[in-house]
Amino acid sequence: EFTHSLKRFFCMCGFTGFYLNHEKSMLDLENIVSKMTDTLEHRGPDDKGVWCDPSNGLALGHRRLSIVDLSPSGHQPMSSRNNQYVIVLNGEIYNHVELRNELDAINPGFKWNGHSDTETLLAAFEEWGVEKTLDKSIGMFAIALWDLRSQMLTLIRDRFGEKPLYYGWIDSGNDGKIFGFGSELKALRAYPGFKNSISRNSLKQ
């Protein structure tokens, strides 16, 4: 009980990923994002997962610190029931039980896979859309959400920006400019060709 309370206090999952916007082999994507995800092992020692969309060059990786749902059903990256969304989440949705109750009232008999707030968010995205769901959500969180229908990547943070989220363009050479993101900068540095230097032009701005 004490250990679980500490987990809730620190709430340190971690995720990373990148978007090429062009086709790349599944093997290459998995190898790269797996190495990026490994840099975040200290944030999530309980589980590791990766998910890739080779047709778009999109890769997501997650390190899990089990907080709400300790079972394998809380594994991330997680896909929605209708296969429209894939999500990685760092943080906690405090009112996810209330959101579940509201969803259960709309869809009686809906069977949940587990008790994770991540699954609750995905079901809410399906029912209400992303913006309305976020309006209803209370918590501390950083999210990367891939919409397979619109082929759009959305990065999300809580209103106070409590959970870290770094992102930017990486000049990777062969792949051109890629969009990378992660819970820590070290995850971005693990991308091949990443240049660990400061842009003086950006500093001037």
Report residues per predicted region.
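Short, Lys/Arg-enriched N-terminal segments with co-localized hydrophobic residues
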Residues: 1-11
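Cysteine-centered catalytic environments shared across enzyme families
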Residues: 11-205
